[in-house]
């Protein structure tokens, strides 16, 4: 039902993985999603699972949705007998190579790409639905992203390095030690880190 796929080498610094959630489900099945520091674009290739909670967008078939960095878990519930979704999960800081808005604006947000001009659009989602195979869908995504890399939104190398150090220490690295390792003042780092990752 849930399967993960690795990106091509050129995109692996930015994309954690592609994932597919497809299959028959029982109506009313809940799935818990834990915060992982990443953000996702979700393409509804067919029927979808819905976000639980108030003020959540209804995920309609053949559309694109953006899920910003999460600080708390969220839940999906199935309202159909089957689901088919394809996701692109970006590494922390990975999305900033493709677009400019600070990710802090999207923390804990789930937004229809129809309401957002960030990267993908609903028309792109429709072209994915027309592809015959998953491999063709991933090829379309990768071609689009590689083309967008030419826009060359530069990422401050200190921030991905800091994320790497935080992950390596499993989140136990003291902030002062991290500041020493990346040679930046704490206030400046916090501002950049929030913009690039959506987290404080």
What are these model-derived regions, one by one?
Residues 1-170, 174-176, 181-186, 196, ...:
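Alpha-helical bundle regulatory/interaction domains
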